[in-house]
Amino acid sequence: MSSIPNINWNDPNNGKSNTSRQSQPQPQLPSNVSPPNSRAVPTSGSIGGPQYGSSQFSNEYSRNPNTIGGPPFPLQSNQRGYMPNTGYPVQQTAQQRSGDKLQQVHSQQQQQQQQPLYQQYPPQSVGYLAGDVYNPQHQEYVQMNQLPNQHYNLQQRQQAQGQQLKSQLNEQNAMMSASTQQYPVQDFTNPYPNAQNPAEQQQQQQPLRTQSQQWDGYQSQPLYSAAGNTIPSSIQQQIPPQNLSPSEQQQVKQQQPSPPEQGTKKKPGRKPKLRKLSESSSETPQVPKTASSSSSSPTAVNSGKPITKRSRMGCLTCRQRKKRCCETRPRCTECTRLRLNCTWPKPGTEHKNKPKDQKDDENTIEHAEFGRIKVLRGIVEYRSK
């Protein structure tokens, strides 16, 4: 039996459906609504031209913004959404408006975070206004007015500082004069007022000292005799000894501590240590602490050179065989163990190079049959009887 298709009497096509539409069931949409991807079909039998069923769709989209066929992007406040293939604007709901406002707030916050904080310190006063840029004559006038004021302020500060320094120096000079009463105080602010040499200044200071002696009434006695030698040693050390008389120099030398006492306080440097070592080495030559020290000491005394680890000399046999020698005389332990001839160099010739003839004589032996022949002593060893 063939199934009778359900005829929808509200269909604008008057029930004329194709077989392809029956095989593919589609969701039933409300009447007078076109599918989202299809164009609006005009209704037949209508008066006043074709009518598009988009007014109802726009109303439904305003109620439910998630309907199929809506704009795929959020609408801004200054934009108007239009339905696809229609000329009707889409009405935005309150939810979309609130979402747009939130997006604007977020974008403003991000811009504020990205902007660096340039005004970290309070704004400082500027010497010119913005309008002065367009009036260079006025700007030059302002600058000319500011320069003397700045110079005047600097002069005032320098004068105030100079007065403070002078007052402090005057107080110090008063204290020094009260303690010494005879020693002329040096001017620390301007020691060489007329750019004179120190020698000329010293010559000028000499009459001042003579005047102070005459004023105190102690011409015959030397300087500082009236005070009873109550002047501190620091001031006495500052006095140049060239300007003093011979009697004054002797008195200053007696009051100053002796140089050997200062030498004992200081730590000894390297130079005194080296001197002590050289003196001790010249008095007693260094002898290595070995078993052969007693045997090797006479050679050192005869040669006049101190024996060290580098300058030790063994027997000639050990030197030829390139072995370590214990330097025991008359026979070393190595030669006695191997029963070799332990020969020692002549006194005074330990550190001298051997002549060529002597080397040839040492390397040759008298043979009974062959006579005088050369021998390689490093390889062939002849045992003594």
Swiss-Prot record:
Changing residue 322 to A: Decreases DNA-binding. It is found in: Nucleus. It comes from the Eukaryota. Keywords: DNA-binding, Metal-binding, Nucleus, Transcription, Transcription regulation, Virulence, Zinc. SUPFAM superfamilies: Zn2/Cys6 DNA-binding domain. Induction: Regulated in response to carbon source, temperature, growth phase, and physical environment. Expression is up-regulated by rapamycine, and thus is under the regulation of the TOR pathway. Binds its own promoter and is also under the control of EFG1. InterPro entries: Zn2-C6_fun-type_DNA-bd_sf, Zn2Cys6_DnaBD. Residues 20-38, 102-117, 154-169, 201-214, 233-256 have a biased composition (Low complexity). The keyword Zinc applies. Residues 1-19, 52-67, 88-97, 170-200, 279-291 have a biased composition (Polar residues). Residues 348-364 have a biased composition (Basic and acidic residues). GO terms for cellular component: nucleus. GO terms for molecular function: DNA binding; DNA-binding transcription factor activity, RNA polymerase II-specific; zinc ion binding. The keyword Kinase does not apply. Residues 315-342 bind DNA. Residues 265-275 have a biased composition (Basic residues). Pfam families: Zn_clus (PF00172). Residues 1-117, 154-216, 233-308, 345-364 are annotated as: Disordered. One of its GO terms (biological process) is positive regulation of cell-substrate adhesion. Transcriptional regulator of the switch between 2 heritable states, the white and opaque states. These 2 cell types differ in many characteristics, including cell structure, mating competence, and virulence. Each state is heritable for many generations, and switching between states occurs stochastically, at low frequency. Contributes to formation of the opaque state, but is not necessary for heritability of the opaque state. Plays a role in cell adhesion and pseudohyphal growth. Interacts with EFG1. This is Zinc cluster transcription factor CZF1. The lineage of its organism: Eukaryota, Fungi, Dikarya, Ascomycota, Saccharomycotina.
